[in-house]
Each structure stands twice: as C-alpha cells, then as structure tokens.
Amino acid sequence: MAIPTVYVASLSAFVAGVAISLQYYALPYAVVLGLLAAYLPSFLAPTQFSQRGGYWPWFATLSLWKARAPVPTTLHFETPLAKETQYLFSSHPHGPTSWHHGVMITGASTPAFHDVIPGDRRRHLGASIVFRIPIYRELLLWLGVVDASRSVAHSVLASGKSLVILVGGIQEQMLAEYQKHHVFLHSRKGFVKLAIQHGTAIVPVYAFGENDLFRPSTFLLPLRQWFARKFLIAIPLCVGPTWWNPFKPFPVEIHQVYGHPIPTTKCDNPSSDEVDRVHGLFLTELQRIFDKHKAAYATPDATLEIL
C-alpha cells in the first residue's frame, strides 16, 4: 500500500527540523521544533477540499464517542434508509453548538449513524474557519468532515457519497433561543439546486432538544450578528446548568427525526420553478415531522418558525 505523500513529507520535515535545530538548541527543544515542522505538511495540505477528505474509519467509529457522550441521542426514521443509496441530509436546527451534528459524525447515538449510512459513503460539511485551527482540523478530517464550499459539495455528490449539511448555517446558529424552534430556510435554496443537479434525494432532519442543551446569551447580539455576516464567523455565547462548567449541557435527550426522502430528477441546470417546487416539498416535510413528533419530544404547543 502506498504511503500518503503527507506522511512522507512530515517525516522528512521532522528529520530536517531536528537536524537543523540541533545546531542551535539542546535535544529536547530540537525534538519539539522537529515535531512542529513535521506537523506543517498536514496543516498546509488542502485535504479539506477533496471529496475523499481524511476519513479514518477506526477513529470515526471508536466506541469512546458514545461512551463519553453526556446526553443520550436517539435517531428516528420515518422511512428506512438504504446504505447503498445516496442522500443529501439537511439537518436542523443548527443550535448554538450544533451538538447533534457532532453526534451524527461520531455515531454517538442509538442507532449509530454510521450503522445507517457508513462513514466511507458519506461526508459532512464544516465551516472553512474550523480547518484553520491546528489539530482540531485533523480530528474533523478523520471524522469525515470536509470544507463547506460549493465545489467540494459537488465533488462529494459526484463521487456517489451522501452529504450532510447544516443548511441554516451561521444565521440559524445566531438565531438560536433556549427551548425555541427557529430554522433559517426561506432564502436557502442552494442545497436544493445542488441535489437536483446530481439527482440526489433530500432528507429533512430535525433534532428535538438541540436548542435545550444550552442557554444562548443575547449579550452584544447585534454586534455578533454583524460580525458573523461580515466575516462568516459565529461567536456563540451560551451556558449550561453550572457556571463553573459552561461546556456541560443541560441533562436533556436529543431525538433526531429523519423525514421521508424527497426525490429529485437530475438536471444540470434546473429552472427556478423546479427549485422552488422541491424546496416547497422540503419545507412541507420538515413541518410535518416537527408537528408529528413535537408532543413526544418537545411540547404539544411547540411551533416551528421558518425564517
């Protein structure tokens, strides 16, 4: 089996880094500098822009993810999904932390998402900014996350893999309210056009409990919303039940409901009428699964606000 180029480059950089550093520093410092040099090829590699990404099956399916999950998550399917079929999953709400997306990525649910759609047959889109964070980017790449650019999304679907998108994006994230149900979708039609261009069925997904995990703060919210629009970087401020551990969520359960797949007819250049038609079907199905399950997983009088 061929050794990936990035590993060869990392080994070369490590040896060169240590050799050069030894001329100026003691061995421990030289090793540290060598390790930093060895990491550079991985950090600079454009792996996130490839549909293949850096998916590592062993890492992505570790039982540790579910064992350490602080809240239980259950997946519910209106229709059984076929492992060999390609889907575009549009998951909502984003929430302040997109917790349910992390659960999908790691399989920390019952059943595990990778038992439904295997990890090597799907990719998840992640904001470009996260791939600029050292080490964290590698963790995401190993879990099957790639850059949320249009070209990458096209290449993933063209390869036959399924795709998971948080369509609401930063806007939906910044609109998150504790125990409220907002989705930012009326103007979001690009994912529908993308699915039609590849003839891929769209699956609406709603995660009850996502907006119950943390209490978002409205502190400087207008400024943070402006910053998010200007620089495409969200700055969520939220807390859990304890002030000394703000990263611990409230003890709630997440119930992630998958609606009926919405079929599309492949067309390289779909008309706006066709995009609107499929978009309308998507909104209707998302509303249907919300209304059907809200009494069991939220409250009977809960309402879904589509913005």
Q: What do these predicted regions represent?
A:
Residues 1, 40-53, 212-225:
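Compositionally biased, charge-rich terminal segments
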Residues 63-83:
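A short, well-structured juxtamembrane/interface segment
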Residues 73, 87, 122, 163, ...:
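A broad, low-specificity signal marking well-ordered, structured residues that form hydrophobic/aromatic
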Residues 32-62, 83-159, 169-186:
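Catalytic core of membrane glycerolipid acyltransferases/transacylases, capturing the structured
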Residues 71-75, 87, 263, 298:
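N-terminal, post-signal-peptide metal-ligating segments of extracellular/periplasmic oxidoreductases
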Residues 1-40:
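Alpha-helical bilayer-embedded segments of polytopic membrane proteins, i.e.
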Residues 155-307:
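Non-catalytic C-terminal accessory region of glycerolipid acyltransferases
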